[in-house]
Amino acid sequence: MKKMTRVLGITIITAVGLVACGQTNTDHKNHESKEGKKTEQKEMKMNQEVTAPKEMNQGASNDLLTTSLKNVTRLNTNDPLQMAVLTSQTIWPATHKENQPGAVILVPVNEWQLGIASADLIHHPNNGPILFIEKEKVPEMTLKEIKRLNPLGTKDGTQIMVMGDIGAAALEQLKDYKVKQIKETDPAIFAKDVDKEYADITGSYPNSVIIGSSEEEGRLYTTPAVNWISHMPEPLLYTEKNKVPEATIEALKMRKDKANIYVLGPEKIISKEVEKELSKYGKVTRISGETPVENSIAFAKFKDEKTKFGWGFTKPGHGVSFVSNKTPDLAVAGAPFSHMGKHAPVILLEEGKASQPVYDFLATIQPKFKDDPTLGPYNHGFLLGSTSDISFETQGILDERLEIVQESGQGHGGH
């Protein structure tokens, strides 16, 4: 009897164990199925996030009263002179001493090489905007903005810094201010002179430099440098595709062979031979993308952790400027958006539209919240250009892609 009881007990235990095991297998399969669905849903959501919208509302741009949105502020002009003034008024209200500029930088409107390189002087301690001038005169719009700003002056009292060679009549218009001029017009020599001017003001040369192309085919690849050099002390020095100008070599030698040299652009713009030549004067790192759009994104994402050079935008919570590749002058005018406020690098838009690389980049920095969107972080965009250059539809897409979203994918209704 005891034997039978023992056998029966073992049988029951075994049966229960088998049932439990069967239940565990079923639960595991259900768990795997749920996890698989979650992964699939997440992948679908990610794919949705990084592609263009499928259904557009054709009437969205009709009867607009504003061209600025919750996440994207538009400076609505394609005139470089006006863009410079709009930027100046946005960054420097000049209502009191603490938000007046030190010195205003005046740049000939059609000389992009001078314009980009001179942005190094936007940074502290000068702390002032770029405004545009013509060779023989200072436009009325620019004069009025200088008067409104009432620049405080730098350490030596300079209120206006004139870039390039302008006529006597234009200088006469500035007679009420203390003016300093960098007269050089050759791009490489001019960039070297700006580098020296900044070193004279601050007392030392920064170890890091950006090397960009001064040639027309390289213009869009060099353009993103304008925001970094207005944000930080590092200058832009120029090169040609296959030859390093003597002026650039002289500037590099001031770093005593210890320069951190960041080449901006692919080998089709700045050759491997130039990179090799530059390596004689320090450590060379190339930052590049195949197209101007991809190049601007590569620069926005790059960070040298050792030297702290670079934006390093790979996580949420940033400001970003957007400019059409058809209007690069506007990037120079808007460079101060990286000097103060949101400290925004510039992303180029192919013919004013968001392309796949832009969608991919914005997906990596889109903010997400768990249960409280008021905690941030937040992104914000500055759109530099009129609606004829960058459409309201494109602006709406960028606004949505910069918006903070719930990490569960439920949207704002889930909190």
Q: What is the meaning of each model-derived region?
A:
Residues 17-20:
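C-terminal motif of bacterial Sec signal peptides marking the signal peptidase cleavage site
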